[in-house]
Curated annotation (Swiss-Prot):
Gene3D superfamilies: 1.10.10.200, 3.30.70.980. Pfam families: TACO1_YebC_N, Transcrip_reg. Keywords: Cytoplasm, DNA-binding, Transcription, Transcription regulation. Belongs to the TACO1 family. GO terms for biological process: regulation of DNA-templated transcription. This is Probable transcriptional regulatory protein Cj1172c. GO terms for cellular component: cytosol. The keyword Transmembrane does not apply.
Amino acid sequence: MGRAFEYRRASKEARWDKMSKLFPKLAKAIQVAAKEGGTDPDMNPKLRSAIATAKANNMPKDNIDAAIKRASGKDSADIKNIHYEGKAAHGALVIVECMSDNPTRTVANVKAIFSKNGGEVLQNGSLGFMFTRKAVFHLEKFAGDLEELELDLIDAGLEELEQNEEELVISGDYTAFGELSSAIEAKGLVLKKAGLEYIPNNPVSFSEEQLSDIEKLLDKLEDDDDVQAVYTNID
């Protein structure tokens, strides 16, 4: 989704009712990363980033350690990554990424949210050509020379570097996630959030009235416990 709309969404997510759902989602992301790539953060860039994101959101260390421990436990839940595609009101395109130990429950919930809020679920793959998957790092603002930083990170897979009033955003091809993550850490940059995101190839502008309709669906999706991230083609 476009940066301006992304910040609008971020300000909504900062409300306490949203924050109260955040820690379980962060814990789930840590657990899945640890189970997929091992529990040693030094050897697992996705786990390092999941931990850094949790810390940036003030998640207590005990919660982080517990999530990692659950991943290595014999009875740890089999949490799967699940991907859905759909349309919201006014034709806005939506990609929903979930983590769930009960896919049947999750698909029923996601379909219900779309149908009750003016949208529809599409067949997976329908939106593949409308979005590009990128490794995206949201960082604290950088006080140094941005051109020099850009040159330093190009060999690690940097494709785009953008700084605004809120943060520094660095992105590259999704396959460069690990290498970019290591290079960013080596530069001492302060990470707020990182992951693989779906970036719209042709963002679309909507009126305020249309955005209000679309956000009803987005709010409901983000409130669902199994939903980790929601991406749109909104400019």
